[in-house]
């Protein structure tokens, strides 16, 4: 299968000054409105990971749920949800982290993983890496390891992928944007 980064990038809408002035938000909803683009994204990830050796897929709240759940279904893997604070009903582990917009907490059910499990983590975008780093810390606290962190978009100028790599976590993104790219 051939992956055309230009086609995907053309369906990621830049929203200027959202959620605050000076930010160009990368809106992926047009990707999900195009059955062809969604299939291309899902199939690209599935093809990359179909023979990979990991036990679970971890999806980040909220846009990471969209692609993570599709890939978990396609690859027949258990799906672990990493949620924003206060959204999970049972016993949780929590981890604080910094985002490009401020401070937040990420939670996961404490019984989601066991020692020896290996997690492929999904989010829509890697910016500062804060969410995925918090998730990686939670995974490690449960005795599991991180197979890779994957996203549709990388913003390399914000250094998130580099931070993850420095923690020993490989990353994979389908496309990337410069901060000023429209």
Swiss-Prot record:
It is found in: Cytoplasm. Keywords: Cytoplasm, Glycosyltransferase, Purine salvage, Transferase. It holds the Pfam family Pribosyltran. Pathway: Purine metabolism; AMP biosynthesis via salvage pathway; AMP from adenine: step 1/1. The keyword Transferase applies. Its main location: cytoplasm. It catalyses: AMP + diphosphate = 5-phospho-alpha-D-ribose 1-diphosphate + adenine. It comes from the Bacteria. GO terms for molecular function: adenine phosphoribosyltransferase activity. Its EC number is 2.4.2.7. GO terms for biological process: adenine salvage; AMP salvage; purine ribonucleoside salvage. PROSITE patterns: PUR_PYR_PR_TRANSFER. It is an enzyme of class 2 (transferase). Belongs to the purine/pyrimidine phosphoribosyltransferase family. Homodimer. NCBIfam families: apt, PRK02304.1-3, PRK02304.1-5. This is Adenine phosphoribosyltransferase.
